[in-house]
């Protein structure tokens, strides 16, 4: 029997309240559970001590028996110092996808072309100006 330490939703519509329970993975989210080990009230401020209550001893017991916490419960237990959750890092997820990379490359190329054109335009009048001054000097002499 695979066990999970998870949240079971209670409370009224738009007023969530969760119980931290030990349940078989096959049972429904709000259905049958083995033991209630705490509560979670997301409506309270994060610094409120009543926001999350967990019986640490029972959580340790169930973890030693082999129950696995869900992601949210793992955060709670990690904050309590009972469970260490794995650091999650997926650098591939934040990379732009193929179409976005094509757009970025096109924008980069357009920017380089604009910079090259501006540089060429800046150099062209500079070359013509000294050439225009040379005939004027010859006319004065």
UniProtKB/Swiss-Prot annotation:
PROSITE patterns found in the cross-reference section: RIBOSOMAL_S16
Key words, A-Z: Ribonucleoprotein, Ribosomal protein
Gene Ontology annotations for the cellular component aspect, listed alphabetically: cytoplasm; small ribosomal subunit
Entry-linked SUPFAM superfamilies: Ribosomal protein S16 (SSF54565)
Keyword Ribonucleoprotein: yes
Segments of this protein annotated with the region Disordered: 84-141
GO MF: structural constituent of ribosome
Comp. bias regions, Basic and acidic residues: 89-111
Low complexity: compositionally biased ranges: 115-141
A single GO BP: translation
Superkingdom of source: Bacteria
Family from the record: Belongs to the bacterial ribosomal protein bS16 family.
NCBIfam families hit by this protein: S16
HAMAP family xref list: Ribosomal_bS16
Record protein name field: Small ribosomal subunit protein bS16
Gene giving rise to this polypeptide: rpsP
């Amino acid at each position: 029997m695979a066990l999970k330490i998870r949240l079971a939703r209670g409370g009224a519509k738009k007023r969530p309240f969760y119980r931290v329970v030990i349940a078989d993975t096959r049972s429904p989210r709000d259905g049958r559970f083995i033991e209630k080990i705490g509560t979670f009230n997301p409506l309270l401020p994060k610094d409120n001590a009543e926001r999350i209550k967990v019986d640490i001893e029972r959580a340790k017991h169930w973890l030693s028996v082999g129950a696995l916490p869900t992601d949210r419960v793992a955060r709670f237990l990690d904050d309590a110092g009972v469970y260490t959750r794995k650091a999650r890092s997926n650098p591939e997820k934040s990379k732009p996808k193929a179409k976005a990379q094509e757009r970025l490359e096109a924008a980069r190329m357009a920017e380089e072309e604009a910079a090259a054109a501006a540089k060429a335009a800046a150099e062209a009048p500079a070359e013509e100006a000294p050439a225009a001054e040379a005939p004027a000097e010859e006319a004065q002499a």
